[in-house]
């Protein structure tokens, strides 16, 4: 079995790639990225495809994979505004998932967000909810929606996470504490990736659509 990872240079996507490439359940793990992968992610089972022309990524989606793991996302600041963020977080995810489905992919794992709701009055949560809705509508054999709380972790030597670095540092103080619910159950991106890969390969869970909350993600991440 082969998998494709989108967003593989990001916080959760890089963890998808890490755990999928280490898992014997996958023979090959493809990664389509805009920039080269870090050296530690270039293992024997990883097939790296680098292209800055994101409008052509659909053509690069391999036909011999059946599992899509996507952590493709950006921030409003990095994208230069909410409209551009929407084009990446929603439009790219949905369009690429649509191509993957047409090429025979059976499983889609999407990193969403705590509080995602297509009817939310908060633009970010509405964006995530609409992305979930449209991915589910593609009707994969199995769709797994991961809804982490505040994301913790480091990427490329810079502290990254939900909100600014100060919020992330505060969240880390509440990580797995009795007060974790007050900050939306913060979780490390590495844990999100670990759980996503595990659920993608778990044939014992037969639900067509699985929505996994941050508390459940934290619980599953503790399991070996």
From Swiss-Prot:
Protein name (database record)? Protein FMP52, mitochondrial
Topology with respect to the bilayer:
Peripheral membrane protein
Top-level division of the source organism's lineage: Eukaryota
Gene that encodes the chain: FMP52
- Its main subcellular localisation, reduced to a broad class, is mitochondrion
Q: Which protein family is named in the record?
A: Belongs to the FMP52 family.
Q: Give the InterPro entries listed for this entry.
A: NAD(P)-bd_dom (IPR016040), NAD(P)-bd_dom_sf (IPR036291)
The membrane-spanning stretches of this chain are: none
Where is it found, in Gene Ontology cellular component terms?
mitochondrial outer membrane
UniProt keyword annotations, A-Z? Membrane, Mitochondrion, Mitochondrion outer membrane, Transit peptide
